[in-house]
C-alpha cells in the first residue's frame, strides 16, 4: 500500500520536528566558551545547559505516557512544539545565565514530549507494510542532525553570535507548527487509564536526580564542602526512595522490575557509561579547542563531526 500525498507531507512535518529538537541539543556545545565569557560563568555552571536539558528531557518521557492517554496526537504535537519554541525564544533573548538556562529547560520539556508523540503517530497512522520505511526515514534524519549540528553552530558563532542559533531554531519551529495544525492526524486519546501519574514519584525523581546532579556539579567547583555534600546526599536519598516506591506501586511511573533481568541491567549500565562519556566529551572538547588552543568555534564543531557521523552509521548496523 503506497503512502498518500497527505501521509508523505505529515511524515515530513513529523521528521522535521524531531530533527529540529535533536539538532538543538548539539548546537549548544560549540557555543559554551562564548557563553562562559559573555555571561561570566565557569565550566561547571555552563554545563547545566546540556545536563539540565538532558535531565528535564528524561523526566518528561514517562509523563508523556500519561498525557497520551488523555490528549489527542495533534494537540500533543502542537503543544510540545509550541513549548519548545517558547523555550527557544526565551534562550535567544536571554541576557543573563538564569534566563538562558530557563529557556533551555522549557525547550527540554517540549522535546521530551515531542519525541515519544512522534513515534506514536508513526506507529498509529502509517500502515504496517509502510511503517518500516517511515521509521527508517525518521531514524536516518535523527542520526544526521548530530553530525551537522556542531559544525553549523561553530560557523554561525564565528560569523555572527550564539544568540542567532536560537533565533534560527525558533524560526524553524514556527515553520513546523503551522502545517502541523492541518497535516498531523488527530488520533483520539487512548483513555485506557493504564498510565497513572503519581505526584510523589514525579517529585522524587525530579528533586532526587536534580539535587544529585547539582551536588556532583558543585563538588567539582566548591570541593567537599557542606552544601555540595548535603545536596548530593539528599539527591541520592530521593533517587533510592523513588526506586523503592516504584517496586511497591501497582502501576508504577517507571517499571524498575525490568532491571531484575541481568542482561538488561548490564546493557543499561553500559549505555549510561557510554552516554556519560559522550556528554562529557561534547562539553569539554569545544572548551578545550577554543579556550586552550585558541581555535575557532567552527574548528571545534568540525572536531565533533567525525564521531557524530560514525554514530549515525553504526546505530542502524548495531540494531542488526
Pin down the residues of each PLM region.
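12-transmembrane solute porter fold
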Residues: 7-23, 28-32, 39-56, 63-65, ...
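Hydrophobic alpha-helical interface/terminus motif in multipass membrane transporters
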Residues: 32-35, 121-122, 156, 184, ...
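Histidine kinase transmitter module recognition
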Residues: 19, 38, 89-92, 128, ...
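Helix-loop-helix hairpins in multi-pass membrane proteins, especially solute transporters
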Residues: 54, 61, 65-200
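Short, Lys/Arg-rich, polar N-terminal cytosolic tail immediately upstream
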Residues: 1-3
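Hydrophobic residues within the alpha-helical transmembrane core of Major Facilitator Superfamily
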Residues: 19, 55, 89-90, 105, ...
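Hydrophobic transmembrane-helix bundles of small-molecule transporters
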Residues: 158-269, 303
